[in-house]
Amino acid sequence: MKRGIAESYNRLVNVFVIACDTCIVGGLFHRFYYWAQDTAWEKTLQASEFQIVATLMLCYLLCAMHTGVILYRRKVFAYEVLTRVTKNVVFFAILGGGILQLGGYMDAWSKLFLAYLLAVLVCVSVFRLGLRMLIKVYRTKGGNLRYVVLVGSTDNNRELYQELTSQSWAGYRVLGYFDFEPNGHFPQECPYLG
């Protein structure tokens, strides 16, 4: 039962993040399309805004589903989130740019498209890092916790206890430890359970 709840939580985070990322991609291109009107950049756009935005959003959705989301993991660091976002945007640039160029929708080699891709990279990175921070705050306040009981009181378990309790944002709470007898070297905050 608990495993099912955790998996549904992970799926919910995945769907939410990918949907928001896709909306960011579409909204950003809408802005860039608006800014390009009545300028020299307008010549790079050979199709309607709807066709280009729909193509870009579909391409980004496919790329995001392929690379995935790691925000729900217990221990994920900012560089891992940024690496995943960068990989996703590179795949998106290749797929989306290729389809736009081959379909004759726009010139994918233009500076407008490059600026758009850089804006996508920055906005999606900021969104995902902000969401990761919110997940950390939620877990620090007691949401989505995992309760842990350690078996044994060896040096490894003491280090594991320190690792699990030093970062409350990871969402672990240690209830205590089992061993043959209480260990004086184990922290007092971790009760002996038997």
Residue ranges and their predicted role:
Residues 1-140, 172:
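Signature of alpha-helical transmembrane segments in polytopic membrane proteins
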Residues 26, 133-194:
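A solvent-exposed beta-alpha-beta segment
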